[in-house]
Amino acid sequence: MNDKALRTEALSVGLEPPSFKDLLIPIPNSGTKKKNKKKKKPKAKKNVETQANVDLLGSAGTDSAVTDVGANNGVIDHQASLELSNLNSRISHPQLVSANGDDSSLINVEGISSTDWQFTLESDDTIEHSPQCILSTSSFVDEAEFPVHIPGLEDATSSNMSPNSVQNNMNLNTVALGSSTSSKRKKKKKKKSKANSASLNVDDQRDFEQVYSTDVAITYRNGQALSYYNGSVRQASMNNNVNNNKSKDIWSSSNTEEREQIREFWLSLSESERRSLVKVEKEAVLQKMKEQQKYSCSCSVCGRKRLAIEEELEVLYDAYYEELEQYANIQRNLANTESVNASDEGSDKSQKGIISDSPKLLSIPLNNVPSKSLNDDITQDELNSSNADVDEEVIETTSLEEKNVDNQEFVTSISNGNQTLEDTSHSPQTQPPFQPPYPSKADEKNSYHSDLYNFGSSLTVKGGILTVADDLLKNDGKKFIEMMEQLAERRMQREDNSNFHEPELYESGLEYDEDEEEDEEDVDEDELDLMTDEQRMEEGRRMFQIFAARLFEQRVLQAYREKVAQQRQAKLLEEIEEENKRKQERELKKIREKEKKRDKKKQLKLAKEEERQRREAERLAEQAAQKALEAKRQEEARKKREEQRLKREQEKKQQELERQKREEKQKQKEREKKLKKQQQEADREKMAREQRLREEEEKRILEERKRREKLDKEEEERRRRELLEKESEEKERRLREAKIAAFFAPNQTKEGSDGCTTSSQLGLFEKKGDLVNDEDKLSSHLLDSVPNALRQAPIGLKNTNNLSERNASSNLLNSSLFSSFNSVNPLISLEPNPLNRTLNNSVNLTDFGRKPNGLHSPSSLLSNSNNFGLNPNARHSLSRANSPVHHYPFATPPSQRANKYPLNNGANVPALLNSFSSPQLSPLVNRVLNEPSSSPLSSSSLKSPLSKEGVLNQQGHEQYNFSLSPSIRNKLSPICRPSQGSSPKLKNNLSNTEERMGSRALLDDKTDSVITASNSTTSGLSRDESSNPNNYELLNAFNQNTWKISRSTSNKSLIPESPWGVALGAFTPNASTQSIPWGNRTWTD
């Protein structure tokens, strides 16, 4: 059946195999008309040459991947160190996770190179690790070369050529891919250079192949493999027996043992691990292939050629992947139907059915059946190397496919793989070699081609991922490993054939002449022209098969190397640990030995010490016995001596007691004598002291008596003198009052008041004669009119007048004479002080009109500016209680206090005894008014404004002082402090008032002195001596409290000797309390 029939059958099944006809660049048919002379002989020679070159190429490509590991142990150790470093880097970077989500990672391949295109997958940070990119960085750089059968490029496999020369050769020979052909002369030179390079490097290629085979034997020998699973390194261990038997061969192994170790390693892997090793992704491989071209020539010609090659390769990859993917779909459908049928028959039959179905799946006809020309050029070495290459790149890509499409089939194949392990390993009939449906005659003659075809037929694509058929991975993967071994055996045969034909090549090359070369060129051109599209498609498939085989092999080798490195690392750690343990054991042994020696020495020392102690104890016992005997003898002697001593002491004590008794008696007698003498002396001193005291007492009494007498005399003289002074003052005051009363008498009669002055009194003032005689008469007349009871009453009760006198005094201020006073000085106020109201309510003699001492602040002068603050109808306007600067409070009205305290004779005392009314003006006032020039009220003096000031007269009472001019007085009298003998209650009130009103600040302690009774004849405040009292007659006339009380020497004076007591009418709190008889009652002061 030809290709057309195969396409028809594929279309009937539902497949549409792609054709490469439109994808490849057409080759010029310039040589089609030439004759095919000498075709067979040159062609046979050419086949032999190309076969040898391809064999050397495959061996060189795969050998370059393992040049780091030699046959000797030194090379193996070096490779082990590289593997350990790679393992540590991968463990520290667990980000390489497959894209299908099953957390299975892969073992990366970094170097896949070809002699024609230099495919080297190396570490490159420019490649992004996309979910579909499975190729990543690794420390292993394995170069797997892929020689595609393109005439004219076989001799580019020389390892001594530089990358630029290889690239130039590749670019010059792109005729097979559709580029324009060169002249025959250029082809001759090119082929000669290739043949020479191939012949010169045969020995080098052998050496590479020798190293590769040795390295494969070493690598395939050791026990375990590493696969990345769930983001961590998973160690797939073999059987314990295998590990125990082969652990001694880890550090050294032979070529014969490595194959067995590789086989055991592959069989020890699970199905999922084997599946992960045979997966590769198309895009990553193409990307690496393109990146490799960056290191070639960068000229425009080479760049165009390189782009053409890359595009052609991509077209070939795409077409082949599409065919394989369609074939994989057919396999999957058949496998699903067979698995359903097998499940009905039971577990045992299902296992056999799966095994028997494997050849059926592989026997499906494909359009990618390799042709004879393709099979002739495939070598065993290339397939072995491609095995390892494919293994690494297929891991994650298949996992993507399985996740989306064939997840169930993947799980079923894993579960069934272990069950069919033993059956397939012991039944070769279940693994018949796969033959193409229509093999050619060359394939029937050569079993190697059938093996390669079986491998190519086993490749499949799932979701753009190249992998191997499932039956090669099941049954412990024996099919796959057996196929790899068969390909390796074919490689060995090819090596023998190449060695056998090598002399012929050199001979044939020497015998050729130019004509033969030209004929050969013509034949080659004819062969190129005769290549059909099917051959080009088969060439592309062949390239993919070689690539997959080498990649799979490289994957397995690298996994095995990592497992060996892991084992070596573990073994090294174990040896180190064992060495440490041995060291510790040796040290412990030494320590134990030292301890034993020390114990023995201690025991010897203890024995010697015990012996010494025993001897010492015996010696001490003997000494103790001797000491006891000696002590006994000494004790007896001591007792004897003690008895004798006691006897002597007893005698001495007796004698001492007798002596003490005699001395005590003598001392007693002496003490008695001394006491008697002391008693006599004390009596004499006592009598003398008493006598002296009596004399001193008598003397003191005499002196006290004399002092008292002197004081009494002085007191009597003082009282007498004061009485005389007071009488004279009283006379003067009465005279002034009489003058004032005479002065205001006319106004008083006009207003209809009850005046007390008689016509005889008024007549006395009409004359302008001697004022003194008139005043004396008037004062004597006024004194006669005072009742005797009032004269004997206290001072506070003497100041009583008729209401007519009060009205007269009030009318005096309201008269036209003082109208100027009222208008000029609005500051004068006669309001009572609140303190006086408080004192007026006390339950003592203030009810009789007694006023406490003390001054009040003149701050009340600021109010009641009109008419001195008086109501014209007020009856007590000029009384002492209404004075703004007076210290007396308002008196109680007469209606409330009349007949309150009766006198001794039964007469009622007026209630307002202490409210002093203004008397009638004396003739002195008239004289002053009639004589303006001599009176202080002259016209010249009236020009200045009047001011009302509270001043004190000679008796210390307040009076009204109408100051007409500042020149009238040189200095105001200072306000003195109260006496120290004032009562506490009034003293506190007055002191608070003084502090508030500022009376303390008005006294200058340095310049002003308080006039007392002892140093001044006048009581009250001090005044300037230069001022004439006569100038103040009119002002003194306003002083109303002029009643005095006569004192008797027999009775203690009620008036205190302090200046305030005299000034305030003797009613001060410091006055001694006396009981004064007053009618039927007693007045207590």
Swiss-Prot record:
Biased composition (Acidic residues): 510-526
Similarity field: Belongs to the NST1 family.
Compositional bias annotation for Basic residues: 32-45, 183-194
Annotated Low complexity bias: 932-948
Organism: Schizosaccharomyces pombe (strain 972 / ATCC 24843)
GO biological process: negative regulation of cytoplasmic translation
Protein location: Cytoplasm
Broad class of the protein's primary localization: cytoplasm
Modified residues (Phosphoserine): S883
Comp. bias (Polar residues): 979-992
Stretches for region Disordered: 22-52, 176-200, 418-446, 492-526, 577-731, 877-900, 927-950, 971-996
Gene behind this protein: nst1
Comp. bias regions, Pro residues: 430-439
Basic and acidic residues composition bias: residue spans: 492-504, 577-596, 606-621, 629-731
PANTHER family recorded: LD36051P, STRESS RESPONSE PROTEIN NST1-RELATED
Protein name: Stress response protein nst1
Task of the protein: May act as a negative regulator of salt tolerance.
Annotated coiled-coil segments of the chain: 561-744
Any single Gene Ontology cellular-component annotation: P-body
Keywords: Coiled coil, Cytoplasm, Phosphoprotein, Stress response
Transmembrane domains' residue ranges: none
InterPro entries: Fungal_stress_NST1, NST1
